Amino acid sequence: MLLLVGFLSPNKNLFLDEDSRQLKIAVVQPVENNYKILNNLTLQAKNDGAEVIIWPEAVSSYQNFQARTEFADIDIIGGFFIQQDEKIFTSIVNTSTNDRYDKRNLVPFGEFQPFDNLLKNLNEFFNIPNSSLTRGEKSQKKVLIQQIPFSGLICWELSFNDTFVDRTRNTAFIIHISNDSWYGKYMPAQHLLHAKARAIESQKWVVRSTTDGISDIISPYNQKKLSENIPKGIKSFKTETISTNMKNTTYLIFGDYPLLIFSFIIILLALINKNK
C-alpha cells in the first residue's frame, strides 16, 4: 500500500496536463466589504494585467452588484447573496455570465438554524430572528471562466472531503473564497495551510480570496517561489499567472474510498485474530 502511494505521489508528475493553459489571475483582499475599496483594488489588479479578478465571500447581494456600472468590463468572480423567490443563497458567481455555485455546506447557527421548524414558534415568542440561508443542491454544474471549468468552494467547504472531491474532479483549478474575519487570531493561518494541502492533493492551483486575510494564490508544484501572501488586516491584491490542469489525481478519482476499505480490512482482520 505504501509503495503504491509513493509511486502515485504528485512528485512523479503523473498528473500534469499537456494541454494546460496560462491564466493571469488576481485575488482582492478589501478587509471590509466596501465597494469603494473593492473598486480601487480591482482597478489596480486589472492595470497589473489580471484577466480574472477574485473577490471574497459574501461581498453584498448580487442585485446590489448588478446595479453598479463600474465593473461592467471586468471578469470578476466573487461571493454574493442571491435572492430567489423566498430563498437566499450564498454563492460564487461569475459576474460576466451570471453562472453560479450555491454553497451547500452551511455553518450551523451562523448561516442556518438547526431544527428550524421545531424552533420557529419559540423564536416568534421570544422575538428572535428566524432567517436562514438555503443550502445549495448537492449536484450543481461546474462554473466556467473563459470556457475553463473551475472548482468553487466557499469558506469551510474546503474541509469537507466529499464536497472537495465532487467540486474539484474534472476542473482546471480551484477558487476558494472565505470570510475568516470572525475566526480569531490563529484560524486564518490554519485555513491557509489547509488550502495549500488541497493544492498538493489535487495538483491544481488554489486561488484564495478572503475578506481580511489570509489571501493567496497557491501553486501545487513549488510554493516557495511565489510572492508573499496578503497578511491578515492588509488591504491589497495579489496577481499570479497560473496553469490550468484538467487531470485528476488518484484522490480526486477515488476520494476516501480506498482509505475506508483499507480501514475496514484492518478492523476485520483484528476481529478475526481476536476470535482465534
Task: Show where each model-derived region lies.
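Internal/C-terminal transmembrane anchor helices
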Residues: M1-L14
